[in-house]
Amino acid sequence: GDVYKRQVITLFVSKQDSAFGADSGDFSEVSRLHRWQINLATGQVSEEKVDDRPGDFGRVNDNFVGQPSQFGYLMALEGEGNSEEPVYGPKLYQYDLYNGQCKEHFLGDGTRGAEPVYAPVPGSDAENDGWVMCLVHNETNNKSKLLIIDADDFSAAPVASIELPYAVPYGAHGNWITDQQLR
């Protein structure tokens, strides 16, 4: 098919050098954004680190999965060398995968974020026309909230902040689905 006409497949992955340190309870390695390129004509595969900032749980606008995507989103990680637990950071990253630039969205003092989830504007074909949603845990008051961020103005204040009546545990993952997808 059409994919073979492209000759080079490019993948962006959140990769760490090893999954664990000394054992499965050692989280001293944190992941970073890498670019893998697979040349279909020559069979060669290359790897390049895109950024030194630790991040994980990468996402794109789900309407662009498996297609060329300009924008990718990662949750920041902190605690490099922490052998006891991976530390979710207080930021999200928006990468322009075409030019390598990265914008940051600060989630607040004393907070830890979660996996970013993309919600596109219904009916829009523009990749960056939508919202990035993130569960945020406040370590100070042990409460959680859902932040909704304009993908096209990523570093700006959230367009909405929804306080939740309980603390969402770390490691929660999710997806955005429309009413039509539920039917």
Where are these regions (language model features)?
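Conserved blade-ending motifs and adjacent loop-strand segments that build the rim/top face
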Residues: 49-61, 102-122, 155-173
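Short beta-strand elements that form the blades of beta-propeller/WD-repeat-like
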Residues: 9-14, 70-82, 129-137, 181-183
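C-terminal structured "cap/appendage" subdomains that terminate the fold
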Residues: 119-164
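Beta-propeller blade signature
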Residues: 24-42, 88-99, 144-154, 163
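Extended repeat-based solenoid scaffolds, especially LRR ectodomains
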Residues: 13-15, 21-71, 76
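Generic long, charged, amphipathic alpha-helical segments
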Residues: 84-135
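Short, small-residue-biased leader/transition segments that mark boundaries at the very start
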Residues: 1-4
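Sequence/structural signature of beta-propeller domains
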Residues: 10-14, 20-28, 83-86, 140-143
